[in-house]
Amino acid sequence: MRLVEVTEMNKTYEKFKLDNVSFHLESGHIYGFIGANGSGKSTTMKGMTGLINLDSGSVLMNGKSIYELSSVEKEKIGFTMDEICLPDNLKVNSLNKIFKSTFDNWDENVFFGFLNSFNIDTSKKIKELSKGMKAKFNIAISLSHNANILILDEPMNGLDPVARDEFCELLSNFILDGEDRTILISSHIISDLEKICTDFIFINEGKIIIQEKKSILDNNFIKINVSEEEFENIDRHKIIRYKRAINSYDILALKENSEYFANCENANAEDFLVFMIRGKTI
């Protein structure tokens, strides 16, 4: 079941453009949104949630345009950004009253349960929280108003490896413990996304390169390092992308062509991204 449909999203700035961005999110899936800095991930997420006005295009959430959602329907969307957009002087525990009056579906028991499990001191002010604690606080908010769609923009920034692992487990449980749920998450730490994501969406310079299941990426692509001499003699039809290395070439190819290459390795999502952005075609 498709919970989110983004169709031909366009947004033009002076030095950047989202160009006909289209993809979909299905129930029961976690989508890794991958691209280099400045590729359009944050702009896309803001466009999905109505935080910026689009030049053209449409976004459907739970079957309705984001511009037609009621206040209660909007609560089905949990959106977190890298920074907390709340007054720094407010204490963590006092924010519960604000959220309770803001969200019809606010569950303070869930909220304080997350704060307790995250070891967040509720007597502290927002400005007194570390970057990692702010990241945890952000996700606690998103998971406490009965959202079924999570849009997470670099939510693991500032978390140490143990906390990131806990965070990944939390997101996996969010999908497993409920029906009709989906997650779109961006992160520059692609190895973390590979632990939990079922699918990947690649974006570069404001354009979607590909949307594909992780299993297909894992099982269909290989990377090879060859000498300059070997590169000159390779059948060009068997190369998807290539890039220069020191006195050699790195190659991305289909696994079905592995018999033609020596010392092949499976290409992961990060490899695929690097080849798509920095690599060249023959």
Segment roles from a protein language model:
Residues 4, 18-20, 74:
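Conserved structural motif at the start of ABC-family nucleotide-binding domains
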Residues 31-36:
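The feature captures the beta-strand-to-loop junction immediately N-terminal to the Walker
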Residues 49:
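Helix-to-loop junction immediately C-terminal to a conserved catalytic motif
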Residues 57-68, 72-73:
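Conserved ABC transporter NBD signature motif
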Residues 75, 81-138:
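ABC-family P-loop ATPase nucleotide-binding domains
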Residues 139, 143:
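Hydrophobic anchor residue at the start of the ABC signature
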Residues 150-154, 159:
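Catalytic Walker B motif of ABC-type/P-loop ATPase nucleotide-binding domains
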